[in-house]
């Protein structure tokens, strides 16, 4: 086909698309006959949709849903169809950029100038080594990502934890899934869901809690909608939210509740079961498979515990002071009365250092703790729409409880950020399991509490790989000596290499930058300066402190703009990779095209940086803090055949085992691999020479080494080649068979192995020995085994630390919209998505707006005690807040809403609550 025919056929196809007509098959055939289609994975949310991508002339030219993909069955959401266009924005980063002065020297106050990869790594090396020498292993920090490929995350964690002996690496998944992780670990003793997406087609009831699935998980919502339409009378949908949204459109019931009162609603449902419908309780299931537990309530809110910190403005201090104590109001006093307190009391946060401590209690104590959560009390504290009558709200709560309680009704509870981004996010995750366990509706086809993931590999990379600051792969943790020993053996490094002290979580890395305790930070595959609450502090920390900030990215987002060095990163289909989705499904893809410009993969950047460090520079005796010094392991390294002049690259990534994975592997035939073979761009690498590849199949090596961590104990993954032949597999994968429902002996090999004569086995090993106590505290020193059992937690209702007041009368909630992904770094570069939603709006109640003489489309200030931004008001659109609440998405850097939000977190998970702070709205 010549150029004229190509243009003609393309024009016909475009015209037909605009007119809504089908395209003649002959035109499609002519247009596509030179395209190469291959399977891949969507770049966006945690749903894990399979897609087909087409390549022609070195570019991705088309994307469509993969009909063979079991997750999405050929459908894409609006973002998914633009997976190709995110790669070709006009301001794509194509070369390293360094801040320099007029002489070309690095200058933190200088302007960005193009530099070579060699110059970029020279500067990185210099500033890293300076920070490492001055501050030790805690003087550096890595902002990691739930958008890393699995291999990238594994390489990063291995370099930091085994190479640098630091645990200061933490992913942006800390912002989205950490509370879910704690909920899983504390309840089941192991991470990730027991169920799978198949539950949607098998259930009778879908209840969403703080999960606007219609916009945030639209493909799953299409499956929910299909299930609803299959049996309109039987299948029920309830949407619980702090504001009305698109998920309510097909819901049978919408329940609008006040922020944080989901805690009270769960306890109301549990009370209904225990007090009013004891026959609904699955006593056999509970007695065989569960124990009752509780923990401390006086744990703070994850803020700094010094309200007089010199970086705080005067307006911030009152809120921060609540980290140490609060004055109980009438409503909170009722929920905490079991602790012997009353309204007006000062409630001191005495257990800030032990937020995750918990112990076994009796069923009688559990029942006693639920007693205050009557329908009258919960309706009073939780009703979120002041225009709704209390009787109507009570009726909805009763209907909700009845749906859960109905004996033969299958129920799935879905949640996302409304639960997880919560100062008691771990608690509310535990409460969901509480109700499902009481009813015996967990780990069964069509029934279960199910945490939906936000990012494409928050499960596969952040959680399973262990890029969190306290974790190692396969649910292991750095504080456990047995886990360190296992990891050191797999990594082939000396004993005592791994630092036993957990590193700084994401927000603490920011605070340590502000305090001058971290001098070097490297950002990969995320945008922390846009996505972290109370952002004015962190902008100042990046620009005004003596530190060096490196950002690897594909576009110049806010984080890149505050950086000292920017590295251009390859995007998803410009590299080999794998993601793990919310239902434990792992999916791999091949590199389809070469990266643009001089961009290189994050794996390449990690390995090239590793070449800059000799063992003698990082494996000597190292002081961590006043209580911990890491011993020198150089002699042990020599005994293992290493030389002190070997680099971390030689030992960790280019060892004998790695080089056994041949570059000319048959699985790679016909596909580029820029990391392994170099490519036609002839990139001048970090050593100033042309990079012609590592010469071994590094991605396959990283995968096969990583999967060793999970084999044999319930985290089994298939081999590399298998994933390239299938549309993903749900782990554990045992004898080639995936697992749909964990802990159920009919479906889970490990459950059957743990308890061959039982229906269920909750075989997770974490925190499975507990003392016994009452509602106040543990009463025994001795710990008792909970082998194969899960925990039913009692957790009290507590309010958010900052609530509306006379000066700041509105709740602020943040989140996403359908058309954009996270901070908009990619999707705002897609013309069609930008035209659809060009700016973040301030959604507010129409009556509130009219009362303030604010019209549709007016520009207002959204202001908190921390900062303010301008936004355009909308009260006619997709989101309908009740009076007293506004909703502002965070994808738009021109509406920098995280300057306004509060950096309070769940103390157990360290996950930020982006959903609740107090603001005032004024005309701009």
Swiss-Prot record:
SMART domains found in the cross-reference section: Molybdop_Fe4S4 (SM00926)
Residues reported to bind Mo-bis(molybdopterin guanine dinucleotide): 79, 147, 172, 176, 209-216, 417, 421, 527, 552-553, 575, 602, 814-823, 898, 915
Principal location: periplasm
Cofactor binding note of this UniProt entry: Binds 1 [4Fe-4S] cluster.
Signal peptide: 1-29
Cofactor: [4Fe-4S] cluster; Mo-bis(molybdopterin guanine dinucleotide)
Role of this protein: Catalytic subunit of the periplasmic nitrate reductase complex NapAB. Receives electrons from NapB and catalyzes the reduction of nitrate to nitrite.
Assembly and oligomerization: Component of the periplasmic nitrate reductase NapAB complex composed of NapA and NapB.
UniProt name for this protein: Periplasmic nitrate reductase
Species in which this protein is naturally found: Campylobacter lari (strain RM2100 / D67 / ATCC BAA-1060)
Record gene name: napA
